Amino acid sequence: TITQNTYLMRNLKELRIAVAGTGYVGLSIATLLSQRHKVTAVDVIADKVDRINRRESPIQDEYIERFLREKPLDLTATLDGEAAYRDADFVVIAAPTNYDPKKNFFDTSHVEEVIDLVLKVNPDAVMVIKSTVPVGYTASVRERFSYRERLADGTMKVVVPNIIFAPEFLRESKALYDNLYPSRIIVGYDRGDSALEEAAGTFAALIKEGSLKEDVPVLFMGSTEAEAVKLFANTYLALRVSYFNELDTYAEMKGLDTRSIIDGVCLDPRIGSHYNNPSFGYGGAALELGDVVDHL
C-alpha cells in the first residue's frame, strides 16, 4: 500500500527516480526522465557506471551519446543499489531477462533481486517493470513478494508490493529516439488497486513529459494484458521479418525480382511498406519467436 508520505503528496517535478540496469532500455529511460527529474542509474559493472558519470554512453546510441554530452541532465550512476532505491519514489526495473533454454523460460532472477532489495530498503516505492517478462509475471510476483505487517492495534495486515508493468517498444541503437517519439505509452497495473491506478497515471505522465512527440496515445490496462501486448508485438514483428525473408528466398530460387514483388505486395494498405526489407533474420534478447510463443 502506498503511504501518504510518498510521491502522491508531491508535485510531479519533485520526484526521485532510480533505474535498475543501464542497457538500452534502462539508460534510455534514465536519460529521458533525467531531463526534468533527479535520476540515479544502477548497474553492477563499474566501467559502465564510471562512463555514465563522465557523460559517456557505454552503449551505441546516437541520441543517448548526444544527450549525455550536450544536455543538462540530472543523472548520476552508481553501483550502490541500496542507496539509490532508499529515497526513490519510482524504481524502474530494466534488468536483463534473457531466455534460458535449460529452464525453457525467461530468466527473471535479476528482476527479483531488485524487487527484493527495494522491499528491504524502501517498501513504499513504486516499482515499474520494463524488462520483458512472461504473461502473468507481474501479478504472480506481487503475490509472491507479499508480506504480513503488524498494525498499531496489534492486528496483522497483508501488504502487497507496489509493482506495475510498462512495456518498452524500442530498437537497439535508437532506444532514446523511440522514447522521445513513442508510438504509444502502455502501463499495466492491478485494476482493483486505486493507489496503483494513480501511480500508473503518474508514470505515464512522466514518460509523456519527457517525450517530444505530441498527442502520444496512452493506454492503461491490467498488467497481464500489458505483458501480452509486449510479447504479441514482438511475435508479429518476428513473423513479418521472417515473411519477407522467405519471400526473398523464394524469389531468388525462381530467378524473380524480389523488389518488384515486395512493392506490389506492400502497396496494399493492410500490409504497408514498413519492415519489408529482406536481410538477416530477427534477433535480440526480447525477440526469440519460438520462446515468446511458448509463453503466450
Annotate the PLM regions.
Residues 3-296:
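Structural/interface elements that position substrates and couple domains in central-metabolism enzymes
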